[in-house]
Amino acid sequence: MQSVLVLAAIVPAALAQTYYGCYTEIPTRALTGAVPLIDYEAMTLADCEAHCTGFDLWGLEYGGECYCGNSLAQGSFPAFSTDCTMPCPGDATLTSVCGGPNRLSLYGTSETAPESLPYPHDPPVTTTQYEGCYTEVTEGARALAGASGFSLTDMTVGGCGGYCRDSGFTWFGLEYSAECYCGSELSVNSTLAAEEDCAMPCSGAAGEVCGGSNRLSVYQWV
């Protein structure tokens, strides 16, 4: 079942279409329905909306790129809201957001968010298993060296787990209340710590634990 992250990014001024949130980009593009509009000097939300007239979806990336399509390509899925923080350069107030590095601020014509199809795991994974509180690696690669995410407002155990699973990883860990790290395995340099070292509440769920200072609440998809 697809994990839905609580998205709390800045929502731009009202437009004719619906804002769905921040989504991941893929190497072959999440939206491939038209020639992209590129303008790193003066891009606005309205410019991208107009460029994508006739399409069901449109997204802005890197502060100046606009992509259109009728569906999301496999591998694109909801990301953390704070991954989309690059301002639109054509907005003099710099309050509207035009995605981020490999992240799309996604809009569309439907009130319902588009279906996303993350890459499948082989064998499939269905549940998470808590592995314990582990130390972060302070020199070299992190304890979990795959994808990562950060959110001061909406980090949860389920959100991190879904993000890492959909990114293709089976291990995930939460640190400092707001950090999420993914990996295919846990570094041998990370060791089991005292459980009380992981006591920081998650930024998006005060009743959940998201690691501690240089400590990871570590889980595995099984």
UniProtKB/Swiss-Prot annotation:
Pfam families tied to this protein: WSC
Keywords in alphabetical order: Antimicrobial, Fungicide, Repeat
Domain WSC: 16-110, 127-222
Keyword Ribosomal protein belongs to the record: no
PROSITE patterns (alphabetical): WSC (PS51212)
BP terms from Gene Ontology: defense response to fungus; killing of cells of another organism
Function: Inhibits the growth of the fungus P.tritici-repentis.
Protein name, entry field: Putative fungistatic metabolite
